Amino acid sequence: MKKMLLILALSVVGFANAQKGTILVGGDIDYTTRTVDAETGKIKMNSFDFSPKVGYQFHDNWTAGAEFTISSLKQDGQMSEVKNNAYKVGAFVRYTMPLSETFSVFADLGAGFTASKGKAYNNDDLISESKANGFYTDLTPALFINMKKGFGLNFSIGGLGYTTYSYDNVDIDERSFYFNFGKTISVGISKNF
């Protein structure tokens, strides 16, 4: 059984109760590590994501902008190793609903292009290589807590999304849907500029 040992998420996104005409600058940093005890030995997986965003707040409740993600994954087994690098480039729209002076909720809807490149090794010999590109869309709701002067904390417990990949060197088309509410947690800081 896969066991999640550590999830670290640092989100730096714009103040959820933002003012019309301001600029949103922010992003996420995520790190995950897992260890699986299998019959063939231990398998360790580490992943890292960096996701900056820039947007324009065209209404007190609405923001639109561009987002980018760069990801790296490494999986080590007893005699095997897998490395994968990926990126996403797209646009997002955010709707924010203030609940009080202290609390707001918001949802980000993003969509765009994604690409991935991976390599698999067995006993340090390259056994396969893959390149893929496709499209993604995701929806992430969150809670904002205003701490002081626009600085605050963001809390998210997952989201939902859909991704497609077409691989260059093999005849494989991949489509994935995820719904991970309650399976992940992201805690971050935010500031409106």
Explain the meaning of each model-derived region.
Residues 1-22, 193:
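Cleavable N-terminal export/targeting peptides
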Residues 9, 67, 160:
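Flexible loop residues that form catalytic
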Residues 16-43:
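Sec-dependent signal peptide cleavage junction
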Residues 22-23, 29, 33, 48, ...:
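Gram-negative (and chloroplast) outer-membrane scaffold detector with strong preference
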Residues 39, 125-128, 140, 165, ...:
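Outer-membrane beta-barrel porins/channels
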Residues 148, 160-164:
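Short Gly/Pro-enriched loop/turn and capping motifs at secondary-structure junctions
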Residues 156-158:
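Internal, hydrophobic beta-strand segments that form the core of beta-sheet-rich folds
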Residues 174-182:
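Individual transmembrane alpha-helices with interfacial aromatic-anchor signatures
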